């Protein structure tokens, strides 16, 4: 639980992984509500200094202020599997109009969150297709990379070999093992999160 709290502070999306983990613990490992509540309490104690700091400084209960930007970075008109972060004139104007006060970080994030949400709603097919491409690229390799050194065998073959053997391992794994099934679940949840929010590094 302490590690979970630290992970939340490092990566905001880890909250989703923790929620899934608690549900899995409850339904498959039969962990009691009391024990899960205790784990949540330890997590809250771990992150409480940061939460208190945000309440005091910006009057807001928040863990991360980069959710909107990360979502936009992976879901904007110029975004590709490996990037393409171009801020258009209208978005630049919105950013420039944000008041330079203690709420700047929150409002900056909101501008990108609103724009990313608008992009996805207005063109769901494009972003679903992009999500699928990123998912396959994170799972295997990027077949449309523009980097000249990407397709050097020493670069892509280890990643491809690891991906293929991992999938074979998943297929052949003991489906009755709750521990293995949990690891497989978290493996795919991580890929889904990164495919939705981020671009291929």
Where does each model-flagged region fall?
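Membrane-interfacial entry segments at the cytosolic side of transmembrane helices
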Residues: 29-41
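Transmembrane alpha-helix segments characteristic
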Residues: 2-4, 38, 44-45, 158-167, ...
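Structural signal for the C-terminal ends of transmembrane alpha-helices
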Residues: 23-31, 170-176
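Membrane-interface anchor segments at the N-terminal boundary of transmembrane helices
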Residues: 112, 118-184
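Membrane-proximal stem/loop segments at transmembrane-domain junctions that anchor or position
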Residues: 58-136
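Membrane-interface catalytic loops of GT-C/OST-like multi-pass glycosylation enzymes that act
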Residues: 8-13, 17, 55-58, 148-151, ...
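Transmembrane-embedded, aromatic-rich helix segments that form part
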Residues: 2, 13-28, 65
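Membrane-interface alpha helices of multi-pass inner-membrane proteins
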Residues: 1-11, 21-22, 42-46, 50
């Amino acid at each position: 639980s302490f590690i979970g709290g630290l992970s939340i502070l490092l990566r905001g999306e880890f909250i989703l992984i923790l929620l899934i983990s608690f549900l899995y613990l409850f339904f498959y490992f039969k962990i009691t509500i009391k024990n899960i509540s205790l784990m949540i309490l330890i997590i809250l104690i771990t992150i409480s200094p940061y939460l208190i700091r945000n309440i005091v400084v910006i009057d807001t209960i928040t863990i991360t202020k980069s959710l909107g930007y990360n979502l936009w970075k992976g879901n904007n008109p110029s975004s590709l599997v490996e990037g393409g972060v171009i801020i258009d004139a209208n978005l630049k104007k919105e950013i420039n109009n944000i008041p330079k006060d203690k709420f700047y970080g929150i409002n900056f994030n909101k501008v990108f969150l609103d724009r990313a949400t608008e992009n996805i709603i207005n063109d769901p097919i494009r972003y679903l297709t992009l999500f699928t491409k990123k998912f396959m690229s994170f799972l295997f390799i990027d077949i449309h990379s523009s980097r000249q050194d990407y397709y050097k065998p020493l670069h892509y073959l280890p990643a491809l070999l690891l991906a293929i053997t991992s999938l074979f391992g998943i297929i052949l794994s003991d489906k009755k093992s709750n521990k293995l099934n949990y690891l497989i679940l978290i493996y795919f949840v991580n890929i889904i999160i990164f495919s939705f929010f981020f671009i291929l590094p």
